[in-house]
């Protein structure tokens, strides 16, 4: 398990299989727990494997209060763009995130 701390906002991304391509969700709340993100990344790996997909799980957590939500999401999108463009990670919306929030990716 690799956990990357974000530098532009209070958050992190948990990748279950190191450098393997990953899929998973982005969650936003006042306090997203790292342990929960790691478990979600691991379960996403197993779910993908059950469908014969050769990808790992990746789960992001953004810690932001409602008044700082938009700024946190914008910073996150700007910071992880390279991971998405390179094919390293395919994120989807989870709790607290709308599909339009990730449109810039």
Kindly give the residue locations of the regions a language model identified.
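N-terminal ligand-binding/catalytic initiation module
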Residues: 1-105
């Amino acid at each position: 398990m690799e956990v990357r701390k974000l530098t532009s906002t209070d958050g992190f991304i948990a990748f279950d299989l190191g450098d393997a391509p990953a899929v998973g969700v982005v969650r936003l709340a006042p306090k997203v727990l790292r342990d929960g993100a790691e478990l979600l990344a691991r379960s996403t790996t197993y779910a993908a494997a059950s469908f014969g997909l050769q990808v790992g799980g990746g789960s992001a957590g953004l810690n932001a209060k409602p008044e700082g939500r938009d700024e946190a999401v914008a910073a996150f999108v700007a910071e992880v763009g390279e991971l998405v463009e390179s094919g390293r990670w395919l994120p989807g919306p989870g709790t607290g995130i709308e599909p339009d929030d990730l449109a810039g990716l």
